[in-house]
Amino acid sequence: MENKKQSTGSEIGRLLKDNIKSYMMYIALVLIMLFFQIWSGGKFFKPSNITNLFNQAAYVAVLAIGMTLILILKHIDLSVGYVAGFTGAIAAILMQTHGVNQWLAILIVLLIGLLIGLYQGTLVMRVGVPAFVTTLAGMFIFRGLLSLSLAKTGTIVISQKGFLSLCQGFIPDIPNGTGYHLATIIIGVVAVALVIYSQVKSRRNKQKYDFDVVSTPIFIAGLVLISAIILVVCVVLASDKGIPWSAVIVGVILAIYTFLLSKTKLGRYIYGIGGNDQAAELSGVDFKLVTQFAFCSMSVLAAVSGILYASRLSSATPTAGNAFEMDAIASSYIGGTAVSGGVGKVTNAIIGTFVIMSLTNGMNLMSVDISYQYIVKGIIFIAAVAFDVRARKK
């Protein structure tokens, strides 16, 4: 009997050791949230704070999605923070100073983001300037343009309700007498069903072609953990005003990029170039065009990030964009994007974003000095990357 218990215990230990990497991010996120829930005196899981967490994370999550593509291709974009700040300022100037319709202003800003991506992508792929140098120069340029654009006015307060609702509004509810936001509950249940369906389908496809998959017990445990996170968050939000529009925007962008990377030739080309660019080129892949797309995509998403940040603050400020790129890069790497390129998922980058922003949010609740916040985030970042590097070597 004792030997049987030891055998069972060692089997569980082996399963955890062999498969923990697959769900480490989710486990870390849950532990961080529980830690701050306890040490903040129950403030972390208050509906108002979870809503605030979503709005805090939205602009970083959008950047992390785009950054994942760049990092998979073994490049980097250091300019995205101030591209976001600059485009947010342009949106505010167009609306408040020149009276441009808010939706037209958003479209113009997205086009500006596209042009920035074309400019930087051309320098990298056509001229041959390294991405690090190109985007570092871009960081200086767009920081200067942000300062110039707000030099005369300073902070510009935004009053357009539609624009502000992007990061301050909530999805409409279905009338009911329960006291809960019913639409949020329904979306949560549908989201869980979609996650289970997609994960099971993905697992079966991998098994069909004899790819490695996690063991069945760990797979089921992972599904339970992910489903529990989604349902708990949705129930908490449903007890207040429901899902914020910022979460919907991030969700739509996430769905688009998940489809792009997993279901299209372009996605396969991105992974192929990141894994071995010479082999991809010999196979007929236009790696310059693919990389150009990634930089254009990144800058457009930076513009979206700038819009969300300006909406959240109800203003455009000269300090907008500061260190955004650091949070985006950290989120992507914490989410499991390989330092060597060729590996990464945008869904995991979102989890990485919530790990970073949950740390920030929780430490703010506990009134931790900003200096210590940077130290803690740095330690978590290097620990996550070190864990990933060691796991890949094994």
What role is predicted for each listed range?
Residues 1-32, 154, 192-223, 286-289, ...:
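Cytosolic-side transmembrane-helix boundaries in multi-pass membrane proteins
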Residues 42-52, 151, 234-247, 258-262, ...:
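Inter-helical junctions in multi-pass inner-membrane proteins, predominant
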Residues 99-140, 352:
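Alpha-helical transmembrane segments within multi-pass membrane transporters and channels
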Residues 295-308, 312-375:
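Transmembrane alpha-helical segments in multi-pass inner-membrane proteins
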Residues 31-39, 43-98, 120-132, 147, ...:
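Single transmembrane alpha-helix segments in multi-pass membrane proteins
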Residues 144-261:
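Transmembrane helix-bundle core of multi-pass membrane transporters
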Residues 56, 131, 159-161, 177-188, ...:
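Loop-to-transmembrane alpha-helix initiation sites
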Residues 199-214, 255-295:
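Membrane-helix/interface signature in polytopic inner-membrane proteins
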